[in-house]
């Protein structure tokens, strides 16, 4: 394998990160490839300097505080159209109830939310409105402008605000590359270009979780539901619009 630059993949859920992790398993030797950093307790006391590829569901601000060589790494991520992203994330957690082995390995707080989501008809405006009006706890942290949260790391109990949005856009502008899920293949090729990887690489694999059954279909044809969900995507939308209108590479 060719020597590649040290990288950190900021793995925002439901943005094709499983595919990217699988790709880099082929590019980086096993002993220098580490995924799912969120599963490691006491990260502050660990040394990751020997790892070429780091990936995890860890907000960027937190990663920069606990990984000592973060300034030496190329950092990239993928973002997604916010309504589609929100619905995919809600659906993924809800669908855990249909797969007992996967359901059982998740923390109780996730199981509790999955069971709650399973009782909601997300095509029913009144039920969705009731859910949004009462959202708190883990559901707030999981669904409130989750992509902005992955940059700025606000408290789980705190709603995001316009200051978080501005900070997230500023942080995103400073990392090596921000890819777009809706332009996935081109974004992956651009990541490889930023890393100076010129190998003959196949991108034929299917996206992980691509069969995730959605709780709402054709959201953009349902203006009333979009209006109800808007508080959960308003700042993510500003972040997304910023990067679909600009050159996505900051290299």
Each language-model region and where it sits:
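A residue-level signal for conserved active-site and pocket-lining positions in enzyme catalytic cores
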Residues: 16, 81, 179, 191, ...
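A cross-family signal for N-terminal binding/gating loops and helix N-caps
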Residues: 2-66, 78
């Amino acid at each position: 394998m060719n020597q590649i630059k040290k990288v950190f993949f900021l793995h925002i859920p439901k943005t094709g990160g499983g595919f990217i992790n699988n790709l880099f398993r082929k590019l980086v030797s096993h002993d220098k490839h580490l995924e799912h950093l969120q599963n490691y307790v006491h990260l502050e006391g660990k040394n990751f300097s020997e790892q070429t590829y780091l990936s995890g569901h860890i907000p960027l601000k937190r990663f920069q505080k606990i990984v000592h060589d973060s300034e030496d790494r190329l950092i990239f991520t993928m973002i997604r159209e916010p309504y589609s992203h929100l619905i995919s994330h809600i659906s993924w957690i809800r669908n855990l109830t249909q797969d007992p082995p996967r359901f059982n390995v998740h923390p109780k707080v996730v199981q509790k939310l999955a069971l709650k989501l399973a009782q909601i008809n997300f095509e029913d405006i009144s039920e969705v409105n009731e859910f949004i009006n009462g959202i708190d706890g883990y559901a707030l942290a999981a669904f409130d402008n989750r992509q902005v949260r992955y940059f700025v790391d606000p408290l789980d109990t705190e709603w995001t605000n316009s200051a978080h949005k501005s900070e997230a856009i500023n942080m995103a502008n400073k990392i090596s590359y921000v890819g777009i899920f809706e332009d996935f293949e081109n974004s992956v090729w651009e990541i490889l270009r930023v890393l100076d990887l010129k190998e003959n690489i196949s991108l034929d694999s299917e996206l992980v979780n691509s069969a995730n059954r959605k709780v709402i279909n054709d959201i953009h044809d349902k203006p009333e539901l979009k209006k109800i969900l808007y508080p959960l995507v308003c700042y993510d939308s500003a972040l997304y619009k910023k990067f679909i209108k600009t050159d996505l590479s900051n290299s």
